Amino acid sequence: VMNSKPGLYKHVLVVDFKSLYPSIMRTFKIDPLGLVEGLISPEEAIEGYRGAKFSRDKHFLPDIITSLWQQRDAAKKNQDAARSQAIKILMNSFYGVLGSGGCPFYDTRLASSITMRGHDIMQTTAKWIEEAGYQVIYGDTDSIFVWLDAELSNLQASEIGESLACEINQKWQDNILQAHQLDCDLEIEFETH
């Protein structure tokens, strides 16, 4: 979460990461089995947080989330809003259960590797937006509010929002491939103006 910049603003874009926590789990292979295997063979592992290391190929949750993601996309395509919402809740519950002391797989390194990575992703994204010449006025868990300090038509503002989302997505693809040798499942979307 970012501090807000109080004021009245015109032409504010909202960009939002699509299912941020599940996409972090998919991208960085965050998973209980992956944690155990990553600690056994740390030289090939993906760095997590608080000492966590995750196996690049021995895991199960990222694959389950990928399957659910595809089912959700199909539900959206078929305009099945109830099914899409149910799958979204199910995918997000994977993070919740890993952060619950009652879960047999509970390990603070799992939940921390999701939330702390999410925080870093949001901070980096805000920095990139500001480097592109726009002002970030607020951010929460997975959304960033961007002020376009100019007189624009709704169409112009929407075009900037779409372009900004494409630019950020490409930056994340490049960044994660270069830094971690991983495919990126993060996707930011222009939500509204």
Regions found by a protein language model. Name each.
Residues V1-H193:
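Conserved acidic
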